[in-house]
Amino acid sequence: LSGICHSIENDLIYRGGGPIFYKHFSYKLDVEKNGRVRDRSDIDQNMEGLAAYVLKASTMRPGDVLFVGSVSGRTASVVDLAYEAKKMGIKVIAMSSMTYAKAVDPVHSSGKKLYEMVDLTLDNCAPAAEAMMEVEGIEAPYAAASGIASDYILWSVTSVAIEELMKRGITPGILKSANFPGGNEYNKTVVEPNYEKYGW
């Protein structure tokens, strides 16, 4: 999972009821410096070329599945990640808003947006500019739509994936709540033998 939403990734990864086959994937370029503080947000989001090096240095392999999230689908680094992952034989699924993506221009040098680079796009149906609500006296809308929608979609996908694995005779590791009696002990029996050997 990369860039979906911190709260959603936390809702899926390492929590009670969550499968162990999901792992967080993130990266950034950090340069040691003694100069003045500079806002790097625009640089980090629109830097092309870094994804290829990051993927080669990662443990991802052909046949793995990478979920990539960007509501607008135009951020260059996200598009670059999807492009480079596909070149490696990784299946790429996007979580994006088609309404938003079609309302903005691409930033990536290919002239493409995220949904045009992936194997499958899950449309979270967020409006352009993301938010749903408006109030008189405030120019910006509020209440982002993508979080709730993406959470629902990803848990639906997860449920289908678990059912499909079971049909194939594969029992995926599902974590119990650490706050439930015996939860931690059970989780050790699931994570250590399953994930390290099989990835599920």
Predicted features by range, described:
Residues 17-18, 163-200:
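Active-site phosphate/pyrophosphate-binding segments
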